[in-house]
């Protein structure tokens, strides 16, 4: 019975992890940080957004780090997913503790956007690097392989045309995102109803919010929306979507749903990020679309969908994006993007795990 130490701090990483587990033998035992039984911590305990939030939770993060290093002694191999600020130092400490411990990094940090030096650290401390973006392999020397993209395993609904019956609203999975973006979505939805008549409005809520007081999280205006916990099905049925920056924007692009990306951070966090990261776009679909068109990812001139970031985000901007988007062009180009990513990744990662465990 192989024991795998998992560090999956993000909600999206845990969705990818669940798909991966379906491709692994049933006797694999998981320990560490993930959504499920026998976890040391739930990913919800790591729901941190912004530089000041990290400082406020530093004591907890250091404690969790130390516990994970100790827990690694029980593991046959280590699986790290995303969250590089936590996971790269973790890989370093585990490798120092046991140089023979096999470490896989799946969902690599975005070294193509900032902190390119992390690529050397990953190759030094990890044994296999599972890249989910075709272009990011070029930033590594030898240990990175393109394994496909996990969303192509997980998405079961793909549009055949741009028709849809609903408007979908996805204001994020963090309380701070919801507080900043949901009120703008509410106002846009109300104006659209005044201008175009009633359309079904669907609010997609993260599945891990089930059982929580949604009115306390979203406010009284949540009553204006139908509630869905199934993002993919809701996007498939939608005419258009309003989405907070994150994995959901790429999901919409792959499904074929026209959308606008909305994002607003704390002013200080945004200014720090602008100093560290040199990108024109923050949406994954736009970044991939640049690469697809042989442009520098995130810095190209081509754009698949509109982005409204920081002070550019407004109700007027959301309405303009809805009204002016060339949906026929968008749909055609979204099909190209799906072809570019080629295939899912779960089976390939499962095979590589078996190889590292000497089970093949």
Swiss-Prot record:
A cellular component term, taken from the record's GO annotations: membrane
Molecular function GO terms recorded: lipid-A-disaccharide synthase activity; phospholipid binding
GO BP: any one term: lipid A biosynthetic process
Organism domain of life: Bacteria
Reactions this protein catalyses: a lipid X + a UDP-2-N,3-O-bis[(3R)-3-hydroxyacyl]-alpha-D-glucosamine = a lipid A disaccharide + UDP + H(+)
Keywords for this protein: Glycosyltransferase, Lipid A biosynthesis, Lipid biosynthesis, Lipid metabolism, Transferase
Record EC number: 2.4.1.182
This protein's pathway: Bacterial outer membrane biogenesis; LPS lipid A biosynthesis
EC class: transferase
Pfam family, one: LpxB
Family: Belongs to the LpxB family.
Role of this protein: Condensation of UDP-2,3-diacylglucosamine and 2,3-diacylglucosamine-1-phosphate to form lipid A disaccharide, a precursor of lipid A, a phosphorylated glycolipid that anchors the lipopolysaccharide to the outer membrane of the cell.
Name this protein carries in UniProt: Lipid-A-disaccharide synthase
Species: Helicobacter pylori (strain HPAG1)
